């Protein structure tokens, strides 16, 4: 078991009103599993993913990832934990526009203290794995949406994380590119035995997931 969540709750204040977004989520995910979490906008799935990634604290509950209780970690401890254990893929790619594909993929290794030579070698190797060997020196504005997402995927995997959290990774892509990206994610899932947790609206993801979990009104169905 690589992820264990027990009774996760989260409430937001909207003016004078408290809105309960997560109402007690309990979930276990095995190592190497490709899990899809589906649900309508406002169901709480992105909030849950942010809590899993240590980006947002929960109000109540326990989260164990890779045998680490993360709900009690401070900001510095969380940053170190994310760097060593997790990778993130976003709908909007979140690439640095002034950097090349190679430099974007290198970035997490800088924070890990990896030498320049090793950073370049590892970033090149990862870009080759995602099919961008010939686009390494292009900036995001010179790449298609699918190519930018491939750069984002390479960056997410560069530190060899145990867990990848993906928030609507195909949300900005056309149907053909969506299939290409999902094929890539599943291949990486199998080849690296990396655990994937994918939040999505897309029913296409069902075909790739080992398990599909529906979230509705802050609860798992």
What are these regions (language model features)?
Residues 2-215:
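ABC family nucleotide-binding domain
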């Amino acid at each position: 078991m690589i992820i264990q969540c027990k009774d996760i709750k989260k409430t937001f204040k909207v003016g004078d009103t408290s809105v309960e977004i997560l109402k007690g989520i309990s979930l276990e995910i095995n190592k190497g599993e490709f899990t899809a979490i589906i649900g309508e906008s406002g169901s709480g799935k992105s909030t849950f993913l942010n809590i899993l990634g240590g980006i947002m604290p929960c109000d109540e509950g326990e989260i164990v990832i890779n045998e680490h209780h993360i709900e009690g970690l401070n900001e510095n401890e969380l940053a170190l934990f994310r760097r060593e254990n997790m990778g993130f893929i976003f709908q909007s790619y979140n690439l640095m526009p002034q950097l090349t594909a190679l430099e974007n993929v290198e970035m997490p290794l800088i924070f890990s203290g990896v030498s320049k030579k090793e950073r370049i070698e590892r970033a090149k190797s990862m870009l080759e794995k995602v099919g961008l060997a010939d686009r390494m020196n292009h900036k995001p504005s010179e790449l298609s949406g699918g190519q930018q997402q491939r750069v984002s995927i390479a960056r997410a995997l560069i530190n060899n994380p145990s867990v990848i959290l993906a928030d609507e990774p195909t949300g900005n892509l056309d149907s053909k590119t969506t299939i290409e990206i999902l094929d890539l994610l599943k291949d990486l899932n199998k080849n690296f035995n990396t655990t994937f947790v994918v939040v999505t609206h897309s029913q296409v993801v069902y075909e790739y997931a080992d398990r599909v979990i529906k979230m509705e009104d802050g609860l798992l169905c």
